[in-house]
């Protein structure tokens, strides 16, 4: 099972240790790849920046990738529901790509390419923190799927 997490921008120093730790913990369940896409800078309007970022992401996706875009308008669920849904997805998809947009959101073309939209919470998080939260939920999901204890 291959899982890729694509995020706009370079991860900040204080986020990297948590990301590294979760990727290490997840390695017994899946191959995790983190891809950081450069912010599209130099554009005076956000729409052009978002379009450029989306083009960069979409160009790296394979047609067979199952793409889940993290977006505030996406479907929300609790950890058990996420684990159950994720379990179904990994049984039929060999490659799942989670996409986390930058601080200004994502272009509509990326939403159209996504197979589904997922909201991590009704709360708003920085895209940097969303990476850590997603990794934690993936780890929790694998523990639930495999009937393993998590932290209790």
Curated annotation (Swiss-Prot):
HAMAP family assigned to the protein according to its UniProt record, in alphabetical order: 23SrRNA_methyltr_H
Bridged cysteine pairs (disulfide): none
Protein location: Cytoplasm
Protein purpose: Specifically methylates the pseudouridine at position 1915 (m3Psi1915) in 23S rRNA.
Signal peptide: none
CDD domains on file: RlmH-like
Residues that, per the record, bind S-adenosyl-L-methionine: 70, 101, 120-125
Lineage summary: Bacteria, Thermotogati, Thermotogota, Thermotogae, Thermotogales
Source taxon at top rank: Bacteria
Cited Pfam families: SPOUT_MTase
GO molecular function (one): rRNA (pseudouridine-N3-)-methyltransferase activity
Main subcellular location: cytoplasm
UniProt protein name: Ribosomal RNA large subunit methyltransferase H
UniProt family annotation: Belongs to the RNA methyltransferase RlmH family.
Alphabetically ordered keywords of this record: Cytoplasm, Methyltransferase, rRNA processing, S-adenosyl-L-methionine, Transferase
């Amino acid at each position: 099972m291959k899982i890729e997490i694509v995020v706009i921008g370079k991860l900040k120093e204080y986020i990297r240790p948590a990301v590294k730790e979760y990727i290490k913990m997840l390695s017994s369940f899946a191959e995790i790849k983190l891809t950081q896409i450069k912010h599209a800078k130099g554009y005076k309007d956000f729409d052009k920046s978002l379009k450029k970022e989306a083009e960069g992401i979409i160009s790296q996706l394979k047609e067979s990738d199952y793409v889940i875009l993290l977006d505030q308008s996406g479907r929300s669920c609790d950890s058990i529901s996420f684990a159950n849904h994720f379990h179904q997805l990994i049984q039929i998809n060999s490659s799942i790509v989670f996409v986390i947009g930058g601080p200004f959101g994502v272009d509509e073309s990326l939403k159209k390419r996504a197979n589904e939209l997922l909201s991590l919470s009704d709360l708003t998080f920085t895209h940097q923190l969303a990476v850590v939260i997603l990794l934690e939920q993936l780890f929790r999901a694998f523990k639930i799927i495999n009937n393993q204890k998590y932290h209790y």
